[in-house]
């Protein structure tokens, strides 16, 4: 079983990594093409394109300028440890053992606007490029056109390496839309996490993002390997709802008292 999650806007390059293990991103030739496009933009243009403050736009223009295809521990950090934010708060990889990291390396992938698809230990230089950005490029009007079927092809390769065909979608709609389902040789399982609010269960963005990370953490820590085991997930008060679920769409509920 292979999991996919979204990246995060917040990055941490100050905290020392918990491991010396690292791998190189596999698709840097594509990333290089995007960087060359982004280098043509002024800070004001990046601000408009990405809806960023002037300060953040200037920071990211500087990042594009210093980006180099030579990735080392001195200019990059393992992706799983560099990303922060709600999903990664739930994942809490900072206490992973080496065995946890190796399991994650095989069973977890992070979707990325710049890198396409990342393994947990892939070194990553800092960037900001959300998948929904309308960056005109030689392949089309946005990043969905740029990546095309490539991400699906790479997921197929990762699944084939496992000898499996189950893809667990723990990513946002923005990012999972970069996966072309008709090109994917996999059974896709989607998951919803709903919290009680005002008398009914709803998807609340902050809680749902953290819950996706919690499920990824649980799978890694417990070495979960089959879809049949997923209904046992019970971190932080979530419980499986058989009445609301189907074989390929799992629903977990949480009461207000557990939030």
UniProtKB/Swiss-Prot annotation:
The lineage of its organism: Bacteria, Pseudomonadati, Pseudomonadota, Gammaproteobacteria, Pseudomonadales. Pfam families: H2O2_YaaD (PF03883). Belongs to the UPF0246 family. GO terms for cellular component: cytosol. It comes from the Bacteria. It comes from Stutzerimonas stutzeri (strain A1501) (Pseudomonas stutzeri). Disulfide bonds: none annotated. GO terms for biological process: response to hydroperoxide. This is UPF0246 protein PST_1170. InterPro entries: YaaA.
């Amino acid at each position: 079983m292979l999991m996919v999650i979204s990246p995060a806007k917040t990055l941490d390059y100050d905290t020392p990594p918990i491991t010396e293990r690292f791998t190189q991103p596999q698709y840097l030739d594509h990333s290089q093409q995007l960087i060359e496009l982004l280098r043509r933009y002024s800070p004001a243009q990046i601000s408009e394109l990405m809806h960023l403050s002037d300060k953040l736009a200037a920071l990211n223009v500087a990042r594009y300028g210093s980006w180099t295809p030579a990735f080392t521990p001195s200019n990059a950090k393992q992706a799983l440890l560099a990303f922060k934010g709600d999903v990664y708060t739930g994942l809490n990889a900072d206490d992973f053992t080496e065995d946890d990291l190796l399991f994650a390396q095989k069973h977890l992938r992070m979707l990325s606007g710049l890198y396409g698809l990342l393994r947990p230990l892939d070194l990553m230089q800092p960037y900001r490029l959300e998948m929904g950005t309308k960056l005109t490029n030689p392949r089309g009007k946005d990043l969905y056109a740029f990546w095309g079927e490539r991400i699906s092809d790479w997921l197929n390769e990762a699944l084939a390496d496992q000898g499996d065909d189950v893809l667990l979608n723990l990513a946002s709609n923005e990012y999972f839309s970069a996966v072309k389902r008709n090109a994917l040789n996999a059974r896709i399982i989607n998951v919803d996490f709903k919290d009680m609010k005002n008398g009914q269960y709803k998807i609340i963005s902050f809680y749902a993002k953290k819950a996706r990370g919690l499920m990824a953490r649980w799978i890694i820590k417990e070495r979960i390997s089959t879809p049949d085991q997923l209904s046992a997930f019970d971190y932080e008060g979530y419980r499986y709802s058989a009445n609301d679920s189907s074989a390929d769409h799992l629903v977990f509920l949480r009461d207000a008292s557990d939030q």
